[in-house]
């Protein structure tokens, strides 16, 4: 097999796509492979990180049912395609890997046009439109969950999704239990509104309760913090946390959306969770949550339309019961031990 020297990662959009791509990038860098990220929205997520080679290119969704949006999306998509084509010609990669979402479309199209081998990585159990469509042109798909395989038109195999690095161990002295609240990389207003009030209801049952609440970039830190302060709950409220793995390891319970990255990290550290799936995006988060709660047994799910202070506080009290928590941790450990530990890099080498 020809040595792989350069790889393009076609990625963009939210953390659910970008975080797995960055984790995969680390494994490729370890193999002395040069990596370039191409996609829309990278500058917003990566900022001035000089260690990561990336190019933010335009893109648009061609899937809108509104004609004006469809044409606008197609126009942006073409601009991005032209830009990606030039970047790929300059970079001369040996292969490209798409991580889903329309933000990655220009780079994936340019890779196919340049006759570069294309691979895909699918984070969710129900793939999005882009990965399902492009699997017809791909050499293989590495999946975080084996159940996604039935949706693809090429070789598909479960691979180990790299976990974000642990920056440092986190300890909350004297705190018990510790609850982590996170609404994904973009935050979730309903979690910011409902969760603090729900946890205020259980304050009398847990005098040493500590809450680490990640509100997202648009969240109102002051308003969320005020609810905890009024309830006498020790807490930290932040817009983002770069040591997510450390926070999860220090937690007794997580209240979160059910994106694929979060589920993989929860399984890795075996921390039970209450999941409130995002109701849009073709329902993939609900499928993720059902897998985690029903198949794995790692927690419980509350659909957003049923999320109230009362419904959540009841589930939190149940989740913090020692026997319930221990059973859920054991179930997660069992599920994690059954998962594949073949890396995406190994899968690609076998498929070339």
From Swiss-Prot:
Its EC number is 2.4.1.227. It is found in: Cell inner membrane. Pfam families: Glyco_tran_28_C, Glyco_transf_28. GO terms for molecular function: UDP-N-acetyl-D-glucosamine:N-acetylmuramoyl-L-alanyl-D-glutamyl-meso-2,6-diaminopimelyl-D-alanyl-D-alanine-diphosphoundecaprenol 4-beta-N-acetylglucosaminlytransferase activity; undecaprenyldiphospho-muramoylpentapeptide beta-N-acetylglucosaminyltransferase activity. UDP-N-acetyl-alpha-D-glucosamine binds at residues 14-16, 124, 164, 185, 285. GO terms for cellular component: plasma membrane. It is a peripheral membrane protein. Pathway: Cell wall biogenesis; peptidoglycan biosynthesis. It catalyses: di-trans,octa-cis-undecaprenyl diphospho-N-acetyl-alpha-D-muramoyl-L-alanyl-D-glutamyl-meso-2,6-diaminopimeloyl-D-alanyl-D-alanine + UDP-N-acetyl-alpha-D-glucosamine = di-trans,octa-cis-undecaprenyl diphospho-[N-acetyl-alpha-D-glucosaminyl-(1->4)]-N-acetyl-alpha-D-muramoyl-L-alanyl-D-glutamyl-meso-2,6-diaminopimeloyl-D-alanyl-D-alanine + UDP + H(+). InterPro entries: GlcNAc_MurG, Glyco_trans_28_C, GlycoTrans_28_N. GO terms for biological process: carbohydrate metabolic process; cell division; cell wall organization; lipid glycosylation; peptidoglycan biosynthetic process; regulation of cell shape. Its main location: membrane. Keywords: Cell cycle, Cell division, Cell inner membrane, Cell membrane, Cell shape, Cell wall biogenesis/degradation, Glycosyltransferase, Membrane, Peptidoglycan synthesis, Transferase. CDD domains: GT28_MurG. Cell wall formation. Catalyzes the transfer of a GlcNAc subunit on undecaprenyl-pyrophosphoryl-MurNAc-pentapeptide (lipid intermediate I) to form undecaprenyl-pyrophosphoryl-MurNAc-(pentapeptide)GlcNAc (lipid intermediate II). Belongs to the glycosyltransferase 28 family. MurG subfamily. This is UDP-N-acetylglucosamine--N-acetylmuramyl-(pentapeptide) pyrophosphoryl-undecaprenol N-acetylglucosamine transferase.
